[in-house]
Each structure stands twice: as structure tokens, then as C-alpha cells.
């Protein structure tokens, strides 16, 4: 039996007909019914949101929700048929579970995990996770980036220009070397074995990432197996810089 880090609720298969206004997706269910689902990923989902793709939806039991269905998975065919997780609310939840289980040995020892800690030059940013251990160990500022775009087996981030992502890199650099700064790329599909910055979509981000690595930023490109049953950690992808 597979020990999933995260198990999906019952999912409903369908076909993606239309995606519009960032938050909406029209899906034809197996029954033939067409429903409008909430799309929790407002980005372009480059190479993923192809019309006609097989998708999986979750359904809320809350009668007050305007849209009962949520788009969770899209099947792509870059390599073999592969499920891609598109619910951007899940990566941080799953990373928190993985941190609690100490699944990332590269981070070393830590005793406390805090989420959404204020940091940055202007104190207007929040880092996803702040890890602390003994007084002799440097604290860890860890940022998570959901990664769904791929070319072959190479995962790429970002899939569009991200001034917010650029800001995060600049702020993590200011913390070095007094603390450890870690960028964790959550590769939300199981068919990728390598990771690289998406230079063609955001060359500034790629330049900043390389500068940050030279200053001591640690990069964890984390591979995850994603299925309609659940999500599990597969280990690190090879970093291609």
C-alpha cells in the first residue's frame, strides 16, 4: 500500500472545454453534464491547460459555495500520460507535512516549523516556512514554488514573468550568509527528472536565481508523483543551471 503524503478526496473525471476569467473552467463530466469549476491556478499553466485534456475535479459538500467543483488535476502527454497537480493551495500543505516527517535530509536538523513568517527589507513579505534548530545552527528561510511547466523531462519555473518571484529571490539573497535561504521547487508531476529556470519566459528570474546560488542560496527541485489517489515524494530532480 502506497504511503501518500496527501490523499485526494473522491474525484470526478471530465474533459476540459474552456478556461476563462482566470478562475473558471468549463468541464464535461463523464455523465455528459457540463459544469463550471473553480480554477485555483490563476497563472497561464503553460503546456498544461490544453482544451480537450482529461481532468479530475473535487466536489465540495458546502452548499453555500457558488462553484461546487474545483479543478485538481490535468493529464498531459509530454512523455507518457502524466497527471499534473494544478491546485496551488496544495503544495504548501504537502511541504509542511513533508517537513514534519523530515523527508528533506538536505535541510539538516530543525525542531520548529513556522509558516508565513514576515521578512524582507520592507517587512511586507512572508516566507512560506521558517525553520529553527539549536542556537548554533542558522535558521532556514524556505520558499515554495509550484512548478508545472515542462519540456520533455525538464521541469521549468516560472512559466510566465513573475515580478513577485523576482522579489522573493532578491529578499532571500539579503538574508545570506547569516541565515540559510532555500528555494524549494514543487514539481507537481511525476515525469520530470531535471529542473532549470524558465529563461525563455523570465530571463530576469533566471539571472537572479543564478546570482542567488552563487551567494549561497540552496535549491531543492523536489519531484512528486501525482495521481488521482494522492501525492507522494520521489526525491530531488537534477538541477540544470
UniProtKB/Swiss-Prot annotation:
Coiled coil: none annotated. InterPro entries: SfsA (IPR005224), SfsA_C (IPR040452), SfsA_N (IPR041465). It holds the Pfam family SfsA. GO terms for molecular function: DNA binding. Belongs to the SfsA family. NCBIfam families: sfsA. This is Sugar fermentation stimulation protein homolog. The lineage of its organism: Bacteria, Bacillati, Cyanobacteriota, Cyanophyceae, Nostocales.
